[in-house]
């Protein structure tokens, strides 16, 4: 036989517990659990999302600062400094990009480690 979730208290201890804040809360909680637990929990979730929206707004404000409308003078300067683009030239440049300056290098193994030949 067990007491379950109830803690054994003497009669005097039980009266003192019921007079305390925790005891009164437990009494109300047993009568209306949603009102005393569910509703505060849901309200904390909703209010927390409103309070945290300020932090998420900073993220979008930073992205908006990066993307700004350009003035005509800046656009003309950017076009003047732009490299000439030819699709065939880019294709041939990218074809030979990875093969020029690398060589396979064997990484040393730890002592006792197998070679794992496939």
Swiss-Prot record:
Main location: mitochondrion
Annotated signal peptide: none
Keywords of this entry: Membrane, Mitochondrion, Mitochondrion inner membrane, Transit peptide, Transmembrane, Transmembrane helix
A GO BP entry: mitochondrial cytochrome c oxidase assembly
Membrane-related topology note: Single-pass membrane protein
GO CC terms in record: mitochondrial inner membrane
TM region(s), chain numbering: 33-53
Entry's localization field: Mitochondrion inner membrane
Keyword Ion transport: no
Domain of life: Eukaryota
Family: Belongs to the COX16 family.
Function, as annotated: Required for the assembly of the mitochondrial respiratory chain complex IV (CIV), also known as cytochrome c oxidase. May participate in merging the COX1 and COX2 assembly lines.
Name of the featured protein: Cytochrome c oxidase assembly protein COX16, mitochondrial
Species assigned in the record: Kluyveromyces lactis (strain ATCC 8585 / CBS 2359 / DSM 70799 / NBRC 1267 / NRRL Y-1140 / WM37) (Yeast)
């Amino acid at each position: 036989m067990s007491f379950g979730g109830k803690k054994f208290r003497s009669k005097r201890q039980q009266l003192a517990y019921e007079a305390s804040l925790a005891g009164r809360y437990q009494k109300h909680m047993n009568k209306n659990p949603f009102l005393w637990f569910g509703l505060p929990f849901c309200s904390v979730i909703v209010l927390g999302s409103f309070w945290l929206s300020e932090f998420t707004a900073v993220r979008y404000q930073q992205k908006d600062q990066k993307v700004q409308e350009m003035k005509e003078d800046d656009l003309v300067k950017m076009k003047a400094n732009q490299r000439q683009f030819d699709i065939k030239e880019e294709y041939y440049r990218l074809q030979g990009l990875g093969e020029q300056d690398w060589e396979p290098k064997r990484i040393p193994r730890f002592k006792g480690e197998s070679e794992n030949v496939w």
